[in-house]
């Protein structure tokens, strides 16, 4: 046993220090990034935000809606090949190039993903997702996927430390998904005691990944557009959002009614709700590591997308970044004990 003495930070522990700016308007900020990925060699341009691969967020409807903002969607792994075929046949290439095909690490997952990727060459992204990316089996699966799909851009995770970022990139991942326990409906940290404050994880993993020519996506922990800006400021190439995009018409959650008011269910993918829906229940050897919440219906996701992008543009103007690419170089974090004046939050 050992203790690391240095303090690790989450998004709530910092603010971004403002700096002189020559920008006259938020409209002067360019949020689109252009990437060429290390292993696949593929080039992509767009806004580097990703809707999370949860079945109450990462739906076909969400992908269609967010593609108009140049935002990616990691479509959840529980759609059938037949459902994928119908979606591909009814969608334009502009939509499909903003889609990630999500998969687990079983042999059945691999075969299913192979069939989905064969439906249309515009499906260029694969998101290999497990809760614990530290297992040897996971690393081997990433290598297997890279060998099978040499020209596909592979996103793999989740991990929170630099050495595993390096391991996954060397095994074939183009993008490493960073985050254990920060999600709004994730209870891993309280069920297991395992985790890592998200901002520190992003900073450390970005440093490791960029040294090898790889990239990272910050997955979890964002509750406001300001948190998204902090993730990019900390070095994230992409930011994945779950709770911020939940509860919308496109989110896919089941709608329930209480006292005449309608709510949408949103749950973690290791929750009892998710396991009952997809695998028949919680296995006797494990505990649920997610919770289920009821969210008031939030309408179309386009309004939320505009709010997030607007906040991100504003953050860039405060530090003089004319492009999102410049935000990391212009970010200085200050440690704080308060984020906002909360006097009217209960009203």
From Swiss-Prot:
Superkingdom of this protein's organism = Bacteria
Q: Which residues form a coiled coil?
A: none
| Xref: InterPro entries | Aldolase_TIM, GMP_reductase, GMPR, IMP_DH/GMP_Rdtase_CS, IMP_DH_GMPRt
Q: Does the keyword Metal-binding apply?
A: yes
What Gene Ontology biological process does one annotation of this record name?
Answer: purine nucleotide metabolic process
> What EC class is this?
oxidoreductase
Q: Which reaction does it catalyse?
A: IMP + NH4(+) + NADP(+) = GMP + NADPH + 2 H(+)
Q: Which family does it belong to?
A: Belongs to the IMPDH/GMPR family. GuaC type 1 subfamily.
Name the record gives this protein: GMP reductase
Q: Which organism is it from?
A: Escherichia fergusonii (strain ATCC 35469 / DSM 13698 / CCUG 18766 / IAM 14443 / JCM 21226 / LMG 7866 / NBRC 102419 / NCTC 12128 / CDC 0568-73)
Q: What is the lineage of its organism?
A: Bacteria, Pseudomonadati, Pseudomonadota, Gammaproteobacteria, Enterobacterales
